[in-house]
């Protein structure tokens, strides 16, 4: 996946903004799955 598709996936699956998705990816060394887990655990 290219960068935009990864960000779009996080926005769609987690209901977050573009900036939140990018920040989550940056915080997790651009690992999509780690970023998704981090977002989901923060929302709980």
Swiss-Prot record:
Pfam families associated with the record: UBA_4 (PF14555)
Domain of life: Bacteria
Induction context: Constitutively expressed (at protein level).
InterPro entries associated with the record: UBA-like_sf
Name by which UniProt lists this protein: Uncharacterized protein YdaG
Organism of origin: Escherichia coli (strain K12)
Encoding gene, per UniProt annotation: ydaG
């Amino acid at each position: 996946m290219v960068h935009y598709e990864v960000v779009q996936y996080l926005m769609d699956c987690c209901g977050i903004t573009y900036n939140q998705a990018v920040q989550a990816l940056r915080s997790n060394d651009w690992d999509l799955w780690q970023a998704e887990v981090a977002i989901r655990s923060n929302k709980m």
